[in-house]
């Protein structure tokens, strides 16, 4: 009976060690499969790229609204965006810059705070706004037309500040 118990314990230990090694290998394999220079968006605590911060302002019926925005203008920065952040200072946001205007769609994977997603056309006008996008929701939130830029600000701020489709966004990316 004692030998049977020892065999059972040994089998359980070996099985546990084997499963642990498989999990490590799977994680390492996934990391190794990620292209060089890309952020692994599935990593639970992916390292945030170093974003440059620049001024941006919106010309609306309510007047001039100033923001400091982090710039996401390459694939790694655009893929990471505001994921894993739990807060954002008032008057701050992130501007995603794309090489050409086209229909865009964003989601809220690994995003802890609600956001207003503001789609901006090549003419610097707001095309559409997806207001109060829900944290962690992976539903695609599309633009209502081609967009070359996407501004993310804290959820509810666009309505609170009177920002609407048709308003003009001023930033260097629009030659302003």
Label each region the model flagged:
Residues 25-176:
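Compact, glycine-rich, soluble single-domain proteins
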Residues 20-23:
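C-terminal motif of bacterial Sec signal peptides marking the signal peptidase cleavage site
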Residues 1-12:
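Bacterial N-terminal signal peptides that target proteins for export
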């Amino acid at each position: 009976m004692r030998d049977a118990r020892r065999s059972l314990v040994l089998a359980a230990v070996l099985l546990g060690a084997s499963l642990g090694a498989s999990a490590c290998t799977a994680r390492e394999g996934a990391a190794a499969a990620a292209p060089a220079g890309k952020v692994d968006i599935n990593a639970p605590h992916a390292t945030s790229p170093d974003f440059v911060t620049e001024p941006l302002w919106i010309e609306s019926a309510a007047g001039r609204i100033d923001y400091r925005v982090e710039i996401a203008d390459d694939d790694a920065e655009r893929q990471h965006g505001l994921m894993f952040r739990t807060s954002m200072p008032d008057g701050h946001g992130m501007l995603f810059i794309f090489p050409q205007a086209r229909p865009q769609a964003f989601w809220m994977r690994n995003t802890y705070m609600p956001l207003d997603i503001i789609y901006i056309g090549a003419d610097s006008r707001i095309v559409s706004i997806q207001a109060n996008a829900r944290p962690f929701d992976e539903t695609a939130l599309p633009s209502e037309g081609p967009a070359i830029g996407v501004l993310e600000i804290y959820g509810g701020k666009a309505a609170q500040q009177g920002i609407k489709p048709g308003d003009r966004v001023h930033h260097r990316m629009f030659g302003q």
